[in-house]
């Protein structure tokens, strides 16, 4: 492959370091985040890389459903105040940052990763967020920084009891508590797995008239699909060469 692109889920990285340290001690915390990222860059030897941050403004998902992530505590103010210093420190080790207004980092990363993979490059996402798993079937790789290993397709399919390409429909049906997405009433994890193993996908289920759980629920389940699926068409206005690493 001509290039390996490292796509860093910024808040996933820094919040885990923050929690592991029991808080942020300004310079020591910034240094720990920088050292952690630099170690991974040394291990993976990417040719390109970018640290992607969430927009500070409400995203399109919040507009679609105002309950989205409403169950989460806000990012601690002390951590928010350290973000400019983190961006500066990351730039000092040669990797720049990116934020796209009204989009979460996940959508920006998914767009970048899909673009790299479709052009025969190797996209490596640095994150522990399960919502990236559906990208595995597109040739995208996911690296678990704190366990220092790549996520394996077979491992994910065994964990969920489903194929990778069924995960979006699984979360749409059963919900996703971490993002406060409720899913369909009366459909838990076991029922969602059973429905998908029998029918394959939501589209097939909606074409039937004998699945009581989905009766009169087409609009709701499609809304849930929108919420859990990562966008891969965010208008970025950037070029891969902007993220070339030395």
Predicted regions and their residues:
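Domain-level signal for Mg2+-assisted phosphodiester chemistry and nucleotide/NA-binding surfaces
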Residues: 1-94, 147, 240
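Extended two-metal-dependent nuclease catalytic cores across DNA- and RNA-processing enzymes
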Residues: 71-238
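Short, intrinsically disordered, charge-balanced linker/junction segments flanking boundaries
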Residues: 242-246
């Amino acid at each position: 492959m001509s290039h390996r692109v490292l796509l860093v889920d910024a808040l996933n990285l820094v919040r885990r370091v923050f929690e592991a340290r029991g808080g942020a001690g300004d310079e020591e915390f910034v240094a720990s985040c920088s050292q952690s990222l630099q170690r991974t860059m040394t291990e993976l030897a990417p040719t390109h890389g970018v640290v992607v941050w969430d927009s500070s403004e409400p995203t399109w998902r919040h507009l679609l459903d105002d309950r989205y992530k409403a169950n989460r505590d806000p990012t601690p103010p002390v951590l928010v105040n350290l973000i400019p210093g983190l961006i500066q420190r990351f730039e000092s080790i040669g990797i720049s940052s990116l934020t796209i207004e009204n989009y979460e980092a996940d959508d920006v990363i998914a767009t970048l990763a899909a673009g790299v993979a479709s052009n025969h490059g190797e996209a490596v996402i640095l994150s522990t967020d399960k919502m990236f798993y559906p990208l595995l079937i597109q040739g995208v790789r996911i690296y678990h920084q704190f366990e220092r290993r790549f996520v394996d397709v077979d491992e994910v399919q065994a964990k969920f009891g489903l194929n990778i390409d069924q995960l979006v429909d699984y979360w749409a049906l059963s919900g996703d508590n971490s993002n406060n997405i409720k899913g369909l009433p009366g459909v838990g994890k076991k029922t969602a797995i059973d429905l998908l193993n029998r029918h394959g996908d939501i589209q097939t289920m909606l074409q039937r008239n004998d699945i009581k759980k989905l009766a009169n629920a087409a609009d709701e389940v499609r809304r849930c699909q929108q919420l859990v699926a990562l966008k891969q068409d965010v208008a970025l206005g950037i070029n891969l060469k902007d993220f070339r690493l030395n």
